[in-house]
C-alpha cells in the first residue's frame, strides 16, 4: 500500500510505501517541516495496524528544499542514509540558501550520509519492488519510482495532474524533461496511477490523452 501525507506550506506530497506482508516501508520525500508533521509521520510508521513498521529506505525524488524539509530529522530518527541520485547531492549542500528564500528554516544537509542509486536500479521494500527511473529536466538528480505491484509511479515534480514540473530553476531543461517523460514515464501501462509531488493523483492514460505539454 502507499500512504500519502501533505506537508509544509508548499503542500508537498510525502509517500510511505508499505509492504504489508513484511511490515517494511520506505519514506519518499520527507517534507515534514513542523514538529506536528514529524509526529504524524512517525505515528503512522510506529503504530501501523497496532505494530511498528521497519523503515528500510528514505528516498528522494529530488532534493529541492520543499521536498527535504524534514530530511534531517527523519534520517536521524531512523538512523538511515538518504537514498538518491548522485546528480542531486549538491542541492543538499544548498538547502539553507534555498530555504531562506522559500521560507524554510532548514540547515545545509551536505553532511548527511547518502546511498546513491542509478537509473534502472531495483530496490526491494520487503517483497515490494521499486524501479528507479532517472527523469531529469526539472532539476538534476530527479527520479521517478515505479511500483509494479501497486500499478503506480511516484513522479516527484517531473509530472503533475495534466501538467509538468517547472524547468526555469538551476539545472532545469524543458526539452530534456519532455523527452524523458515521454520515454520513461508515459511508456508505463495506462492504468498506472501517477502520484505527484504536489496536487492530486492522476493516471498514465489520462496524462497521455489530456496533458497538453505531452501531446
Task: Place the predicted regions along the sequence by residue.
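Active-site HxH/HxHxD metal-binding segment of metal-dependent hydrolases
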Residues: 32-124, 210-213
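Conserved beta-strand hairpin/beta-sheet module of binuclear metal-dependent hydrolase folds
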Residues: 1-46, 144-156
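Short acidic-hydrophobic surface loop/beta-edge motif
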Residues: 5, 17, 119-125
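Metallo-beta-lactamase
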Residues: 23, 32-35, 49-51, 97-98, ...
Amino acid at each position: 500500500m502507499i500512504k500519502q501525507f501533505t506537508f509544509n506550506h508548499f503542500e508537498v506530497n510525502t509517500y510511505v510505501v508499505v509492504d504489508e506482508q513484511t511490515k517494511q516501508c520506505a519514506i519518499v520525500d520527507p517534507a515534514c517541516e513542523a514538529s506536528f508533521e514529524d509526529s504524524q509521520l512517525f505515528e503512522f510508521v510506529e503504530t501501523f495496524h497496532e505494530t511498528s513498521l521497519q523503515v528500510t529506505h528514505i528516498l528522494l525524488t529530488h532534493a529541492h528544499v520543499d521536498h527535504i524539509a524534514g530530511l534531517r530529522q527523519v534520517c536521524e530518527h531512523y538512523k538511515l542514509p538518504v537514498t538518491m541520485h548522485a546528480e542531486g547531492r549538491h542541492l543538499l549542500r544548498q538547502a539553507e540558501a534555498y530555504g531562506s528564500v522559500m521560507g524554510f528554516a532548514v540547515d545545509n544537509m551536505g553532511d548527511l550520509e547518502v546511498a546513491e542509486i542509478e537509473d534502472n536500479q531495483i530496490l526491494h521494500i520487503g517483497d515490494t519492488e521499486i524501479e528507479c527511473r532517472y527523469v531529469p529536466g526539472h532539476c538534476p538528480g530527479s527520479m521517478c519510482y515505479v511500483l509494479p505491484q501497486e500499478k503506480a509511479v511516484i513522479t516527484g515534480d517531473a509530472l503533475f495532474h495534466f501538467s509538468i514540473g517547472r524547468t526555469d530553476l538551476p539545472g532545469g531543461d524543458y526539452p530534456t524533461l519532455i523527452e524523458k517523460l515521454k520515454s520513461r514515464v508515459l511508456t508505463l501501462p495506462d492504468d498506472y496511477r501517477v502520484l505527484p509531488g504536489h496536487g492530486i493523483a492522476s493516471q498514465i492514460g489520462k496524462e497521455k490523452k489530456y496533458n497538453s505539454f505531452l501531446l
